[in-house]
Regions:
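A short alpha-helical cap/connector motif
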Residues: 1-108
């Protein structure tokens, strides 16, 4: 069991929506970014649990960004996690993100 799957399994905080078989794939591709200044963007954040999972997994140097259409999600911001409200189908909105996020190393569309 890798650290992502362990976090998911032991999580008692915010709800995380992920397919369990994704964790091995995520870990294989993302582990090299741990403890770096990685910029992660996740589109579709639901309850915000996966943003917290990414923050813990990548470490304190990481900057985690969430994108969701639901204005409620803005309330899920915390230190190290910034949330933008908008529609991923809106090209103008997506273009504006490139002005607000200095770089994107990992983009997760959930």
């Amino acid at each position: 069991m890798n650290d992502l799957e362990r976090y998911f399994t032991e999580n008692t905080g915010r709800l995380i929506h992920k397919w369990k078989h994704y964790f091995a794939i995520y870990d294989r591709h993302f582990s090299r970014f741990r403890d770096t200044d990685v910029h992660v963007v996740e589109i579709g954040i639901s309850q915000g649990g996966s943003l917290q999972m990414w923050k813990q997994y990548f470490g304190p140097k990481a900057k985690i960004f969430g994108v969701d259409i639901n204005p409620y999600c803005k309330k899920l911001e915390e230190e190290g996690i910034e949330i933008f409200i908008g529609d991923q189908e809106n090209r103008t909105f997506l273009k504006s993100l490139t002005q607000k996020i200095p770089k994107i190393d990992i983009l997760i569309d959930d």
